[in-house]
């Protein structure tokens, strides 16, 4: 294994992680907001049966182990990217596994918001959309950034497991060389590189979460 091989594997892991997180955010953020706003006491109450179905679907997707989920979504992966093997193919199961997790993280962050802030906005005649976009999300931004950082670091771990289906990245190298060929030194290097990636993402995420916290800027 050369430095170029490790560098390309790091790039593949970074590419898959960032894209999967972005797609998970696109799906998970609105869903997480809906779980809070759609409550019977929320700013945009939805039918109880619909909220019940959403919660069940999220819980089911979150409860399936990632390796099994990858196999279960093979038909969906093939329909979207045309193959079930390779770096791009791993993005689909990663998104399916991560967006329910993101939705729960968003829900948790939004539920920590003081109800008085929302009530004040309602008393001033703000619409549900205005309350969500100009009150709930901005007020909970530090928590949301922290949640996205958690999701990002979790997806790094998932991406390593995707090496089982030839997903590329550090996971594939660790599996192909470290496990199948018993080259423990290569596996250790891959683990160290994954740990460093997690540390970098976590540090950057924590910095921006702190930077966006209005309470700490006073």
Stretch-by-stretch model annotation:
Residues 1-20, 47-55:
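Periplasmic/extracellular loop-to-transmembrane helix junction in inner-membrane transport proteins
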Residues 18, 128-159:
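Transmembrane alpha-helices
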Residues 34-72, 94, 99, 104-108:
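Cytoplasmic-entry segments and transmembrane alpha-helices of multi-pass inner-membrane transporters
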Residues 7-38, 148:
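Transmembrane alpha-helix signature in integral membrane proteins
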Residues 158-188, 192-193, 213, 218:
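Glycine-rich helix-loop "coupling/hinge" segments at transmembrane-helix boundaries
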Residues 34-41, 187-218:
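C-terminal transmembrane helix and the adjacent membrane-cytosol boundary/short C-terminal tail
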């Amino acid at each position: 294994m050369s430095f170029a091989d490790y560098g390309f594997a790091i790039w593949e892991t970074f590419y898959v992680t960032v894209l999967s997180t972005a797609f998970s955010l696109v799906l998970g953020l609105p869903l997480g907001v809906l779980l809070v706003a759609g409550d019977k006491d929320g700013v945009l109450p939805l039918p109880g049966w619909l909220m019940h179905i959403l919660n069940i679907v999220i819980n089911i997707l979150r409860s399936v182990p990632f390796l099994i989920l990858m196999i279960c979504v093979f038909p969906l992966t093939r329909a979207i990217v045309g193959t079930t093997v390779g770096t791009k193919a791993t993005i689909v199961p990663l998104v399916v596994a991560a967006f329910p997790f993101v939705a729960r993280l968003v829900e948790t962050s939004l539920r920590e918001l003081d109800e008085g802030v929302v009530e004040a906005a309602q008393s001033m005649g703000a619409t549900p959309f205005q309350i969500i976009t100009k009150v709930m999300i901005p007020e909970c931004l530090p928590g949301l950034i922290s949640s996205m950082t958690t999701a990002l670091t979790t997806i790094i771990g998932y991406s390593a497991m995707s090496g089982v289906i030839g997903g590329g990245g550090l996971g594939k190298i660790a599996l192909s060389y470290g496990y199948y060929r018993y080259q423990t030194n290569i596996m250790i290097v891959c683990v160290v590189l994954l740990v460093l990636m997690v540390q970098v993402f976590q540090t950057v995420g924590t910095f921006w979460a702190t930077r966006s916290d209005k309470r700490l800027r006073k």
